[in-house]
Design a protein with these regions (language model features):
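C-terminal output/interaction extensions
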Residues: 105-115
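Conserved binding/recognition cores within well-folded domains
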Residues: 1-90, 94
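DNA major-groove recognition helices of helix-turn-helix
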Residues: 56, 104-105
Length: 115
C-alpha cells in the first residue's frame, strides 16, 4: 500500500521495497513512460516505483497536482512562469502546469511566501 504518514515523512512501499524520505526532499513526482510507474525526483536521488499519481495525491495533501502527469511539492517552487505555464523547482527542473491549475498554483505560491 502507498501512503504518507504525515507532513514530515513521505512513506511508501512497493512489492519488494519500503522507502521513507523526508517530505522536504521530495521535489516532484511524474508519470514514467513505463506504464503504471512514477518517477520521484528528490533532492539527493531519483526513484522509479509502481504507483499512480491519484493514489499519491490522496495520500499526501502536501503535494499538489499541477498537471495530470505531475505532483509537485509547493515548498520547492522557486518561480512560476504563467506565460509559458511552467514551474521552476529548486533543483532547476521545469514542470508544466495546466491552465486550470494556474490560479491554485499562484495562490499556493503566494501563501507559502507570506509564511
Amino acid at each position: 500500500p502507498l501512503g504518507i504518514e504525515n507532513d514530515e515523512i513521505f512513506d511508501f512501499q512497493t512489492q519488494h521495497t519500503a522507502i521513507r524520505i523526508p517530505l522536504n526532499q521530495v521535489i516532484y513526482i511524474e508519470t514514467s513512460p513505463q506504464k503504471h510507474y512514477v518517477i520521484l525526483h528528490g533532492t539527493n536521488n531519483q526513484m522509479t516505483f509502481r504507483a499512480n499519481l491519484k493514489d499519491l495525491e490522496k495520500a499526501s495533501p502536501s503535494l499538489v497536482s499541477c498537471h495530470r502527469s505531475y505532483l509537485i511539492n509547493p515548498n520547492n517552487i522557486i518561480r512560476i512562469n504563467k506565460l509559458k505555464r511552467e514551474v521552476e523547482m529548486t533543483d532547476g527542473s521545469i514542470c508544466p502546469f495546466s491552465r486550470t491549475k494556474a490560479k491554485m498554483l499562484m495562490d499556493t505560491f503566494k501563501r507559502r511566501n507570506l509564511q
